[in-house]
Amino acid sequence: MHCLRAIVKGKVQGVYFRDFTRTQATRLGLCGYAKNLANGAEVEVVAEGDKDALLEFLNLLRSGPPRAEVKDVETGWETATANYSDFRIKH
């Protein structure tokens, strides 16, 4: 199992980005969370699962849902914790 941490930047709040993220992560069998950051222009995403699924997920994060305008995605790979049983939207 692998863990992807991403900060997605751009017009990603108020455009259903977190819901899109949860839908795609669930479809790919990933666990973790998506959370709006306080600056209003970034979403933090942590996802754990199969590396191939995570790479596909990362490509989806780069495009986002139709109303989003993704400018940049900062990524890092971490040690998976297996602390997540599903994919959630954090508030």
UniProtKB/Swiss-Prot annotation:
Segments forming domain Acylphosphatase-like: 3-91
Active site residues of this protein: 18, 36
Superkingdom classification of source: Bacteria
Keywords noted in UniProt: Hydrolase
Catalytic activity: an acyl phosphate + H2O = a carboxylate + phosphate + H(+)
EC number: 3.6.1.7
Family per record: Belongs to the acylphosphatase family.
Protein name in the entry: Acylphosphatase
Organism taxonomic ancestry: Bacteria, Bacillati, Chloroflexota, Dehalococcoidia, Dehalococcoidales
